[in-house]
Amino acid sequence: MMKKVIVVGAGILGASTAYQLAKMGADVLIIDRKDNGQATDAAAGIICPWLSQRRNQAWYRLAKAGARFYPGLIEELQSEGETETGYAQVGALSIHDDLEKIDKMEERANLRKADAPEIGDITRLHEKETRTLFPLLAEGYHSVHISGAARVDGRALREALLRSAQRNRAVLRDGDAVLQVQSNRVTGVAVGTETFAAHVIIVCAGAWANQLMQPLGINFQVRYQKAQIMHLQIPDREDTGDWPVVMPPSDQYLLAFDRRKIVIGATHENEIEGYDTRVTAGGMQEILNKGLEYAPGLANCTFQEVRVGFRPFTADFLPVLGAVPGWDGLIAANGLGASGLTMGPFLGSQLARMALGMPIDIDLNDYDIRKAMD
C-alpha cells in the first residue's frame, strides 16, 4: 500500500523531505502558508563546514554529511531537467590577515580531509592570489582556498526540489495546517474547511513550529534569530558566477552569484519581538560596515534588496529530529540554525526514510527531539 505522508512547511527541510518521499513512491502532500521571513527564502548558503572551529562533533558530523550529500542530489535534479538549482561548486577563500591563523586553518583543513575527501584541494594563497580570485577584497588578506566548497541560493534550490517532487505526483498546497488527532494519534491536518488524512505527518515548520504543536500540549522549544542579508550588483564586471565564496574571520560572509550579484551578510539578531521582518537601518549599517571593511570594492556596487529570514535554533544549537513522544504518526525536525542549507537536503533524506520505516544513517540519540520538548 502506498504510504500517505503530509509535510508541513516547504523550506529547505520540508522541500527536501517531500522530494525524497515522492521519489520513493509515497503519496505526498506538502502544505505551506508562505509566511514572510522563511529562513530558506532569504538564505545564501556556504557549503564549507570543514574549516569550522565549532567543537561539537554531533554538529560537525551532520554538516559534513550534508556537504557530502550535495553533488549527488544536484546531479539527480539536473538529470530530471532542473538546471536552476542555485548550486555551484565555486570553492571558498577563508581569509585572514594573521599568518599564524592561516597556518592553523590549513592544518585543520588537512586533518579533516582524511575522512572528508570531498573537501577537494587545499591551497594556501598569498595576498595577490587571493585578490585575483575575489578582486573586491581589501589588501592584506591571505587565504586558504578549499576547492570542494560550494554556494547555494536557498530559494532556487527549494523551488527545484518542489518542482521535481510535483513531477513525482506530490501535491503542494498553500494554507495554514492544523493537526488533527484521535486519542494519541495524529491522523492528518485540516486546511481551512478541508481535512487531509495521512499515515505520517512531518512538521518542518522552522521558526513557526511551536504554533502548530501547542494545541497538542507540546511546548516545542525552538527560538529564532533574525537575519538580514543584502544583495548588491557589481556595475562593471562581465560575470561573477565562478567567484569563490569568501569567509572572513567574523560571522559575516561574501558570496558572488551569476549576473554580477554579490550577497553580503548577515545579521544575527536575537531579541526579536514577534516575527518582525522589517529591514532596519541598524541592520543595513552593520552589514555594510563589516562588508566594506573586508571588501572596499563593494562601495561602488548598486544596492538591490535586503532579504530577511528567521533561523530556528534549539537551546544547545543542535538540530533535533525524530518521532514526537506521546503521539503516533507525528515526526518533527527543527533547529538547523545557520547551517540549514548545508544540512537540510541530507536531513530531508533521513526524515523521508524515517517516515517510511527505513533505516537511517545517523544516530538519533545525538539529535533527540525530547531535548526540545517539555
Question: Can you annotate each of these PLM segments?
Answer:
Residues 3-29:
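N-terminal Rossmann-like FAD-binding beta1-loop-alpha1 element of flavoenzymes
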Residues 6-8, 196-208, 348:
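Short hydrophobic core segments
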Residues 16-24, 33, 45-46, 82-88, ...:
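Active-site substrate-recognition segment that forms the wall
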Residues 46-133, 290:
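Dinucleotide-binding Rossmann-like beta1-alpha1 core, especially the glycine-rich loop
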Residues 61-64, 98-102, 144-160, 278-282, ...:
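Short beta-strand to alpha-helix junction loop
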Residues 144-192, 196:
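Helical element adjacent to the flavin cofactor pocket in flavoenzyme catalytic cores
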Residues 297-374:
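C-terminal catalytic lobe of FAD-dependent flavoproteins
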